[in-house]
A protein has these predicted regions:
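Anion-binding (especially nucleotide phosphate/pyrophosphate-binding) glycine-rich loop
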Residues: 2-130
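FAD-binding subdomain of flavoenzyme oxidoreductases
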Residues: 121-123, 132-160
């Protein structure tokens, strides 16, 4: 049986768009369309969506789009944008910050400063998100994400 994304529209109606134009999702305002665009509001919904597509589609997780060049050719897969609950930021204790992957680097830097935590200053001028910064080990001024990262929680393409 062939997998069809259209079958998921009733279940994910507000957050799943087919044949989606990606131009406005990156800072360069360039690029073509994606076969599908899914906006994940929370972890539970993301897991549910990933389990439904069951590795039948290519996946690209898009952060702020600040360091992303999108081809004019159609992306034959699903672009996932993490929103809402992935923007959470809090203190675990006096020395450790928990930040969602959609938190901007600038916001993480400001949060650290407001809570008297040093070492995050370099993030104030990096345009992007925590998730993207970790993926590419973003950095400047001789500091990188590897210098502030303790651990991550991640999902695989199967939602586990």
């Amino acid at each position: 049986m062939k997998f069809n994304l259209k079958e998921l529209i009733p279940e994910f109606s507000n957050n799943l768009k087919l044949d989606y134009d990606l131009k406005k999702k990156n800072w360069f305002n360039i690029g073509g369309k994606a076969k599908a665009f899914y906006k994940a509001d929370n972890l539970k919904e993301l897991i549910k969506f990933l389990k439904k597509i069951q590795n039948n589609e290519k996946i690209f997780v898009l952060g702020a789009g600040s360091n992303t060049l999108i081809s004019d050719k159609q992306f034959n897969g699903v672009v996932i944008k993490l929103t809402n609950n992935f923007n959470n930021i809090s203190l675990l204790n006096e020395e450790i910050i928990i930040a969602g992957s959609a938190v901007t680097d600038k916001l993480l830097s400001e949060f650290a400063m407001e809570n008297s935590l040093g070492g995050f200053e370099f993030l104030s001028c990096i345009p992007g998100t925590v998730g993207g910064g970790i993926k590419m080990n973003a950095g400047c001024f001789n500091r990188e994400f590897k210098d502030i990262l303790i651990s991550i929680q991640a999902l695989n393409k199967s939602g586990q």
